[in-house]
C-alpha cells in the first residue's frame, strides 16, 4: 500500500487487495450474522444512538464515499451510497469519522487534502455537506465532545507517510 494513491486507485488488481466487506455481528451470541459488500475500503463505522434508530454511517477511504448501513424490509443489512467526500479524483483519503452526540452530523477528516468536512445526516439517506475547513497537512483523527460543543482533530497517520514537522491537535 505504499504506492502513489492515484495509481493505486486506478489499478484494479491493487484495489482487490483492500477490503470491501462489512460483517455484522450478534455480540450476545458472539457470531457473525451477515457479510455484505461496501466498495472502497470502509474504515470506521458510527452508529446512531438515538432511541429507535438502527442505522450507521461508514466512509470508504479509497472511493471517498459516505455509506448508510441499514437493514432493509427483509431484515438484510445493506449499504447505500449517500454522499461523496471532496473530489475523489484528488484522492481526499477519508481516514476518520465522528458522529455528533445528537446524531445530526457526521464529521469526516481526510488525510489526502487535510480537510475536515461536516455532513448533515438528519435524513441519513441524503447526507449533505454543510461545512468544510482546511485543517492542515495530514488530518487524521476526529472526535466530538459529549456535549456537541467542540470538535477535536489531530494529524499523523502512518510514520512512513507523515511529513516532518506537521503534527498537531486542533480544537
Regions found by a protein language model. Give the residues of each.
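Predominantly soluble domains enriched in secretory-pathway, periplasmic, or organellar proteins
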Residues: 1-171
Amino acid at each position: 500500500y505504499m504506492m502513489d494513491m492515484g495509481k493505486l486507485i486506478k489499478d484494479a488488481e491493487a484495489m482487490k487487495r483492500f477490503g470491501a466487506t462489512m460483517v455484522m455481528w450478534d455480540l450476545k451470541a458472539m457470531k457473525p450474522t451477515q457479510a455484505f459488500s461496501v466498495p472502497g475500503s470502509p474504515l470506521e463505522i458510527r452508529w446512531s444512538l438515538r432511541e429507535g434508530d438502527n442505522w450507521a454511517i461508514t466512509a470508504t477511504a479509497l472511493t471517498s464515499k459516505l455509506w448508510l448501513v441499514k437493514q432493509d424490509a427483509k431484515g438484510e443489512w445493506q449499504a447505500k451510497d449517500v454522499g461523496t467526500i471532496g473530489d475523489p479524483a484528488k484522492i481526499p483519503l477519508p481516514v476518520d469519522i465522528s458522529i455528533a452526540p445528537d446524531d445530526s452530523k457526521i464529521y469526516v477528516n481526510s488525510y489526502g487534502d487535510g480537510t475536515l468536512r461536516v455532513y448533515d445526516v438528519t435524513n441519513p439517506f441524503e447526507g449533505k455537506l454543510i461545512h468544510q475547513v482546511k485543517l492542515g497537512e495530514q488530518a487524521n483523527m476526529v472526535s466530538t465532545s459529549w456535549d456537541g460543543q467542540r470538535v477535536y482533530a489531530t494529524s499523523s497517520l502512518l510514520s512512513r507517510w507523515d511529513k516532518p514537522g506537521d503534527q498537531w491537535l486542533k480544537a
